């Protein structure tokens, strides 16, 4: 009986380790980070974005630290008929390099989720 119990514990432990490794998807480049952000913006229909064609009025500005990519999503007014010298920031994302997890400060996302937004970054997928 003890042998079976130990075997079950070992299988459970191994499964948990495998699950953690599968979920850990390192992000190695700015391009990978932007692709994750685009996928998330489309998935959550932020600013009415339903597909990549809807992103023509957006521009992505990227800062990199040792742990993460910080991506500002801005309105590209020149492409959309506005003042070419103005690109207001709409919202930002943080992409964790080690895990690939995302967080955003999008007010629209918080509102859709019914969260009383205080300006902080919220986890998003």
Predicted regions and their residues:
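Exposed beta-strand-loop-beta-strand "reactive/processing" segments of non-cytosolic proteins
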Residues: 53-98
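C-terminal partner/receptor-binding element of secreted or periplasmic proteins
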Residues: 101-125
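Bacterial N-terminal signal peptides that target proteins for export
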Residues: 2-11
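Bacterial N-terminal signal peptides
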Residues: 11-20
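General secretory precursor processing signal
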Residues: 21-23, 60, 83-84, 124
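Short, non-transmembrane alpha-helical segments in secretory-pathway proteins
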Residues: 25-58
